[in-house]
């Protein structure tokens, strides 16, 4: 809510000043008598006053000097509090809207308030020749006492206290913003661009008065012209030389579109337009031979000429549909509004329109685009201008980092509140706690909207924004479970459809206590992984995580509906096969203990943490399993492929070099043969070589990278030699060196050259 000190209540309620001093926007010239009088007349001409009138006005004007501390405050306002000068127009139009709101409210109980004119509008006119900008409204206007109480209040009590608190080094920046926010000086933004400001105003209960200031002092006087405005206020800005750009129609139109598009009242801009018109061609009358003038023919010749005309053009054509109830807005209106605020050529995928009440009241329309921006993740975490904040339909900013969390940066829309207190420049919120309340409600509404998307709509959404939701699970603990309900993953249950976590839990086996998942680069890779073999064979469903962010996402959730997540590529996978199955497994562990001990203590001594009999393998001979807190093969691949990873990162090196568990399949023929050889002799070189090769193939199958790729290639070559009965000692033949003979010059070429010389 834009509250002011007592002195500024009427100003913000009634200011919006536009000149009706012109009759049909024309100004009469006064005769020029002397050089001094000419300069004075120029000043008068701009205000629509004659020379005698301006002399009368100045002789009777009440002059007021701003106190020294007020000058300090004005400098603070002009030089410090506003980050960009263009907001002066926003402030003045906002004040004009307040003035129009007030007269409209008064007219509801007293129609006579509109006796002078029923028009309710804001008009903006630029005079480039004289570097003037006029802003006129037909609002409530101000009486002489209003001018003294309001525009003069800045020089009254409270200023000294305000400045002392503002300059107090012990006062926090938030407290300073609080003070400024309570001291409503939006009108004085005019001095950001103007050296001199003239306010002409007419209230129904008083005569027309003129207030004039150069920011150092001000005067108040009765307008000698009488009532030229009928009702309302006119502000004339004498623009600084560097502010001349604000006289350009396109600049003014763009600023209205940016800040004041949704003001309740029509905003008009004095615009020129060029059009082709038919114009009669004057011809000399034709004569006969005896000199008689021929009769004119009925049809006259015409030509097309360019003609420039000036007229008022309405510049705020888009209506604030969020002010209406959702059931009063057509679907096509939502689509057109989306396109107008986003400049997106495509229609939105979905929208939500709501109003919120409580600690802070606001209205909002939020949209989900059909396509994600191409640079969404290049700009992830940066301020994205997708949510526009309005206060009473006046644009405040879209430069917010905290209006929505980063993962919802694709959401587009508007938020409009009457309750937000703003600092003097309206560039920062005065009470950040209110913004947090709004943010919380916006997130809930967005998630509810996404939850309600039907099958086809959700599929389209998921294909574009699935990564955002997964990032949300990682970044937003307070909404983690709500976001988790939106997650979709491929699974072993259906090759053609994704599944929700809720649907997975419904299909879980009776004594299954964990949600199984396997991460990799593709569905083919994960569904053929040795880690899922026995689970799938036993009828357990496994989630297939094939996106780079998936494993991070799942790791951020400790559980879902009281079911923990279990990465099947890590330790901890247990399959309840009953007591007899457990006894059988213990028997296998005893049987293969010589092999597992030998692998751990001899063959793979420096490569593995331990060797165990696997419960998860069916077809594969072995697998390499990460510890519960280590990197899986997929995570290792992701971490090593980071574009900004350091060459030697201690943390990365720690995880990458952690020893893992080597699991063997007791039913595989290679493992059985290896057990026989080790039992017979632990010095068997073939067994040692086979164990090393088993470890390396298990490393690759399990998704890890090999540390010794050259050694692995050598061992594969040895296997190839053995399978082809090629001696391991057979050497590669030495390449023969072939010398090339030097080319001899061709005789034919020499003959040709000699013939050419002889001709010369």
Swiss-Prot record:
Disruption phenotype: Adults show increased sensitivity to cisplatin, sodium arsenite and zinc. RNAi-mediated knockdown results in induction of the unfolded protein response. The keyword Oxidoreductase does not apply. The record marks 426 as: Important for ATP hydrolysis. ATP binds at residues 95, 137, 150, 187. Keywords: ATP-binding, Chaperone, Endoplasmic reticulum, Glycoprotein, Nucleotide-binding, Signal. Belongs to the heat shock protein 90 family. Residues 727-760 are annotated as: Disordered. NCBIfam families: PRK05218.1 (NF003555). Residues 741-760 have a biased composition (Acidic residues). Pfam families: HATPase_c_3, HSP90. InterPro entries: HATPase_C_sf, Heat_shock_protein_90_CS, HSP90_C, Hsp90_fam, Hsp90_N, Ribosomal_Su5_D2-typ_SF. GO terms for cellular component: endoplasmic reticulum; endoplasmic reticulum lumen; perinuclear region of cytoplasm. This is Endoplasmin homolog. GO terms for molecular function: ATP binding; ATP hydrolysis activity; ATP-dependent protein folding chaperone; unfolded protein binding.
